Amino acid sequence: MENFQKVEKIGEGTYGVVYKAKNKLTGEVVALKKIRLDTETEGVPSTAIREISLLKELNHPNIVKLLDVIHTENKLYLVFEFLHQDLKKFMDASALTGIPLPLIKSYLFQLLQGLAFCHSHRVLHRDLKPQNLLINADGSIKLADFGLARAFGVPVRTYTHEVVTLWYRAPEILLGCKYYSTAVDIWSLGCIFAEMVTRRALFPGDSEIDQLFRIFRTLGTPDEVVWPGVTSMPDYKPSFPKWARQDFSKVVPPLDEDGRSLLSQMLHYDPNKRISAKAALAHPFFQDVTKPVPHLRL
């Protein structure tokens, strides 16, 4: 740790404080995440160390690179490449004008490339949200915190007792499914896609039941026809109100037919029928994809 000089605190992640830091030996600027675990007393679980070490092998231009894992005195520090801004801050800064569609398309395409890569290595994210999608001035966007959920679990609250957001959580997780798949990440990315387009969160729930009901009000309450097996999921209740599905042209008005088609496939209730990242990359929506540069106010 003595090799790093902390420059400033960037923010509070799910698991601990994140600092901008400088490697004293190389001059490289990095993001330093201190992982606060409940098991501080017993030290860091060896399973977590093993999981995290595997992530050093995940090399892809749309994945934030884990440069190093430093394990000292019951504390764990993760050293990541440094990026300028997260998508949440960028969306907030672009709230008046909106993000131009070519940039939205580029971001979605790049994120799907990152997902396809991780999913092909059987690594899930499980907690995708605009805060852990990081952007650079050159038009790149990268997925951060990949694999941390499996190593440390997804807590209900962060170490500072902030509630971990449910807005991007897939319905199978909300309905208590214990065994979920890569499809949970596609759902989250679909919600983020819609948010970039409309400039507001698609399903901003404030509790698990509110989250589910917001999804149901938009996509219709699922039944055995659209989602075989849904009625036997642990948290499914036959007493759920029966809402009808809304037309997607009302849900994401700025999107063209290709965009709506892709979004509806990313938000398919049945995880087995939800489009994969690899298939999404071949969708007609991306036939004219480019890589524009964002106007960053840093």
UniProtKB/Swiss-Prot annotation:
Entry GO CC: Cajal body; centrosome; cyclin-dependent protein kinase holoenzyme complex; cytoplasm; endosome; nucleus; transcription regulator complex
Regulation of its activity: Phosphorylation at Thr-14 or Tyr-15 inactivates the enzyme, while phosphorylation at Thr-160 activates it. Stimulated by MYC. Inactivated by CDKN1A (p21).
Matching Gene3D superfamilies: Phosphorylase Kinase, domain 1, Transferase(Phosphotransferase) domain 1
Modified residues (N-acetylmethionine): 1
A GO molecular function held by the record: metal ion binding
Residues found modified as Phosphothreonine: 14, 160
Catalytic residues (UniProt): 127 (proton acceptor)
Modified residues (N6-acetyllysine): 6
Enzyme Commission no: 2.7.11.22
Matching CDD domains: STKc_CDK2_3
Annotated localization: Cytoplasm, Cytoskeleton, Microtubule organizing center, Centrosome; Nucleus, Cajal body; Cytoplasm; Endosome
Residues of the Protein kinase domain: 4-286
Pfam families in the cross-refs: Pkinase
Catalytic activity: L-seryl-[protein] + ATP = O-phospho-L-seryl-[protein] + ADP + H(+); L-threonyl-[protein] + ATP = O-phospho-L-threonyl-[protein] + ADP + H(+)
Cofactor note: Binds 2 Mg(2+) ions.
Record-marked site positions (CDK7 binding): 9, 88-89, 166
Residues with Phosphotyrosine modification: 15, 19
Record keywords: Acetylation, ATP-binding, Cell cycle, Cell division, Cytoplasm, Cytoskeleton, DNA damage, DNA repair, Endosome, Kinase, Magnesium, Meiosis, Metal-binding, Mitosis, Nucleotide-binding, Nucleus, Phosphoprotein, Serine/threonine-protein kinase, Transferase
Post-translational modification, as annotated: Phosphorylated at Thr-160 by CDK7 in a CAK complex. Phosphorylation at Thr-160 promotes kinase activity, whereas phosphorylation at Tyr-15 by WEE1 reduces slightly kinase activity. Phosphorylated on Thr-14 and Tyr-15 during S and G2 phases before being dephosphorylated by CDC25A. Nitrosylated after treatment with nitric oxide (DETA-NO).
Cofactor dependency: Mg(2+)
Keyword Cell cycle assigned: yes
Assembly and interaction partners: Found in a complex with CABLES1, CCNA1 and CCNE1. Interacts with CABLES1. Interacts with UHRF2. Part of a complex consisting of UHRF2, CDK2 and CCNE1. Interacts with the Speedy/Ringo proteins SPDYA and SPDYC. Interaction with SPDYA promotes kinase activation via a conformation change that alleviates obstruction of the substrate-binding cleft by the T-loop. Found in a complex with both SPDYA and CDKN1B/KIP1. Binds to RB1 and CDK7.
Family statement: Belongs to the protein kinase superfamily. CMGC Ser/Thr protein kinase family. CDC2/CDKX subfamily.
PANTHER family: CELL DIVISION PROTEIN KINASE, CYCLIN-DEPENDENT KINASE 2
Function text: Serine/threonine-protein kinase involved in the control of the cell cycle; essential for meiosis, but dispensable for mitosis. Phosphorylates CABLES1, CTNNB1, CDK2AP2, ERCC6, NBN, USP37, p53/TP53, NPM1, CDK7, RB1, BRCA2, MYC, NPAT, EZH2. Triggers duplication of centrosomes and DNA.
Protein name, as recorded: Cyclin-dependent kinase 2
Organism phylogeny: Eukaryota, Metazoa, Chordata, Craniata, Vertebrata
